[in-house]
């Protein structure tokens, strides 16, 4: 008997709906990354994308512990000399709350083409509305 290897064509990918309201950012991101990789499935294969599609709603109501709202900083560089832009977690949640979850999850996925493919299956929305009703996502309680 040989070791089982999942094939990209035969992998069953489901759609799940996750409500981020009141969830801790890091704990939620860890579970989302695990499910995007497919590590919760018995057919998990490291070099094949076996993960599911995840629709996250209420990103604006995510919770953090301690003083991270003021202390946690996000940095981005515009490409021009001296233009390193910095904003706190509180400012980031005001401007673009969905990006906070996306950045946290992206850092937990593999770097490279396979990780980018897994990341594309994550859909994050600030409010309760999302355009994926046609996929009939199942509610996932994390």
UniProtKB/Swiss-Prot annotation:
One family name in Pfam for this protein: Ribosomal_L13
Subunit structure: Part of the 50S ribosomal subunit.
Record has Membrane as a keyword: no
Family indicated by similarity: Belongs to the universal ribosomal protein uL13 family.
Gene that specifies this protein: rplM
PANTHER family, per the entry: LARGE RIBOSOMAL SUBUNIT PROTEIN UL13M (PTHR11545:SF2), RIBOSOMAL PROTEIN L13 (PTHR11545)
Protein name per UniProt: Large ribosomal subunit protein uL13
Gene Ontology terms, MF aspect: mRNA binding; structural constituent of ribosome
């Amino acid at each position: 008997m040989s070791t089982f290897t999942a094939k990209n064509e035969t992998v069953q990918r489901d759609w799940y709906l996750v409500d981020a309201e009141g969830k801790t950012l890091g704990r939620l991101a860890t579970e989302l990354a695990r499910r995007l990789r497919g590590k919760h499935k018995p057919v998990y294969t490291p070099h094949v994308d076996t993960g599911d599609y995840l629709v996250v709603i209420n990103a604006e109501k995510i919770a953090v512990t301690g003083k991270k709202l003021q202390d946690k900083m996000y940095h981005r560089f515009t490409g021009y000399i001296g233009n390193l832009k910095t904003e706190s977690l509180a400012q980031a949640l005001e401007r673009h709350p969905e990006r906070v979850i996306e950045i946290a999850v992206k850092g937990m996925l593999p770097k490279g083409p396979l990780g980018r493919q897994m990341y594309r299956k994550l859909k994050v929305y600030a409010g309760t509305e999302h355009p994926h009703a046609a996929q009939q996502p199942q509610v996932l309680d994390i």
